[in-house]
Swiss-Prot record:
Binding annotation for Mg(2+): 245, 288, 315
Protein name, entry field: Enolase
Gene3D superfamilies linked to this entry: Enolase-like C-terminal domain, Enolase-like, N-terminal domain
Transmembrane segment boundaries: none
Enzyme class, broadest EC rank: lyase
Binding locations of (2R)-2-phosphoglycerate: 166, 340, 369-370, 391
Family the entry assigns: Belongs to the enolase family.
GO biological process: glycolytic process
Highest taxon in the source lineage: Bacteria
Names of the cofactor(s): Mg(2+)
GO MF annotation list: magnesium ion binding; phosphopyruvate hydratase activity
Organism: Clostridium botulinum (strain Kyoto / Type A2)
Gene from which the chain derives: eno
Cofactor binding notes: Binds a second Mg(2+) ion via substrate during catalysis.
Alphabetized PROSITE patterns for the sequence: ENOLASE
């Protein structure tokens, strides 16, 4: 195997994401003519501690959301340093960009610029070596197909309705394989559409492909999903489980949680009890961002109440950042981390966060963003690191389906070597 393959060109362009906003795409070319291409996603509900996504701010172009500054940073500052480097040395590539940026939050070059380059380098390296991306990142041990955490009802910032909680998801942890899990979710998705239609609800979809009906309450969203699971011929709590992403930072005001759609304002203790009641009533296996990103006391209360039986995922809380994750581990809050590549800005730092989580007994859920592209890197990443869970939207909208289709290809390639862990993927809770 080659041990040095020189980077000869690094080039970025501005493209569009699934929300019709500009984003960065990067091409990295190697001395043997091989090319790696990566496109960067973007979030709607972003954590305050995420790495900076560099936008132009010119209101006359794309309402100020252009990324030409980030593109220029790739084509000049970053390219000047990386051309001539060994594409196989991912750590050195990412370290070089981090040092070039020189800030704690990627504010100078932009996490969108740096991530595009980081991922394009990994893809170019894999292509040059004739390997799949998951094999290149994970080596011989990358073989676990993930349980999908599939968003099928949208609320909060992802939809224009009166549902406060942002995402209501299904997890087919009872499926025997990834392909069967995908089939089950697809059937529930269709059953949900017909259920909503029969009840007179709109079946338009939100940013991530989930339906966005104007339901009467958050609990009604769970009820119609349970109904759809049964209608599709599956058993809630055995075949398919429920997962929630309240995105609580978005409803946290003056130390309390404002459930405006239900006309209630709750203290952190009351909010924790709200989740306890839901988890006792319904087969809820995972809750993401149940408390706000700076409500560490609220997180502690929630973790003490149900952290032994419900996966509690930190997204805005941890932002794929080892410093914040380390604090959470020391305080004993949450038991899982959501992994979003663009929250931290390089592949190396992402892998470090996953490793830290797993060493502490926390699960890692690899995730998309609401503003996505056709890029399928996260599908390869989740298999490479054996994370066992992926969150990448409904089985609708091609930028979501692209990830699922890539996982089907990987499952086929792995054949008997592949493993779908189902409930065993939740090693952080008592099942």
């Amino acid at each position: 195997m080659k041990n040095y393959i020189e980077i000869v060109d690094v080039y970025a362009r501005q493209i569009l994401d699934s929300r019709c906003n500009p984003t960065v795409e990067v091409e990295v070319e190697l001395e043997d003519g091989t090319v790696g291409v990566a496109a960067v996603p973007s979030g709607a509900s972003t954590g305050a501690f995420e790495a900076v996504e560099l936008r132009d701010g010119d209101k006359s172009q794309y309402l100020g959301k252009g990324v030409l500054k980030a593109v220029d940073n790739v084509n000049t500052t970053i390219a000047d340093e990386l051309v001539g480097m060994n594409v196989l040395d991912q750590v050195a590539i990412d370290k070089t960009m981090i040092e070039l940026d020189g800030t704690d939050n990627k504010a100078k070059l932009g996490a969108n610029a740096m991530l595009g380059v980081s991922l394009a380098c990994a893809k170019a390296a894999a292509n040059s070596l004739g390997m799949s991306l998951y094999q290149y990142i994970g080596g011989v041990n990358g073989k676990v197909l993930p349980v999908p955490m599939m968003n099928i009802i949208n609320g909060g910032k992802h939809a224009d309705n009166n549902v406060d909680l942002q995402e209501f998801m299904i997890m087919p942890a009872g499926a025997p394989s990834f392909s069967e899990a995908l089939r089950m979710c697809s059937e529930v998705y269709h059953a949900l559409k017909s259920t909503l239609k029969a009840q007179g609800y709109d079946t338009g979809v939100g940013d991530e492909g989930g339906f966005a009906p104007n339901l009467k309450s958050n609990e009604e969203a769970i009820v119609v999903i349970i109904e759809a699971i049964k209608k599709a011929g599956y058993t809630p709590g055995k075949d398919i489980f429920i997962a929630l992403d309240p995105a609580s930072s978005e409803i946290f005001e003056d130390g309390k949680y404002n459930l405006a759609g239900e006309g209630r304002v709750l203290t952190p203790e009351e909010m924790a009890n709200y989740y306890v009641e839901l988890a006792e009533k319904y087969p809820i296996i995972s809750i993401e961002d149940g408390m706000a990103e700076e409500d560490w006391d609220g997180w502690k209360i929630l973790t003490e109440k149900i952290g032994n039986k419900v996966q509690l995922v930190g997204d805005d809380l941890f932002v794929t950042n080892t410093e914040r994750l380390s604090k959470g581990i020391k305080l004993g809050v949450a038991n899982s981390i959501l992994i979003k590549l663009n929250q931290i800005g390089t592949l190396t730092e992402t892998l470090n966060a996953i490793e830290m989580a797993e060493r502490a007994g926390y699960t890692a859920v690899v995730s998309h963003r609401s503003g996505e592209t056709e890029d399928t890197t996260i599908a390869d990443l989740v298999v490479a690191v054996n994370a066992g869970q992926i969150k990448t939207g409904a089985p609708a909208r091609s930028e979501r389906v692209a990830k699922y289709n890539q996982l089907l290809r990987i499952e086929e390639e792995l054949n008997d070597m592949g493993e779908y862990r189902g409930l065993k993927a939740f090693y952080n809770i008592n099942k």
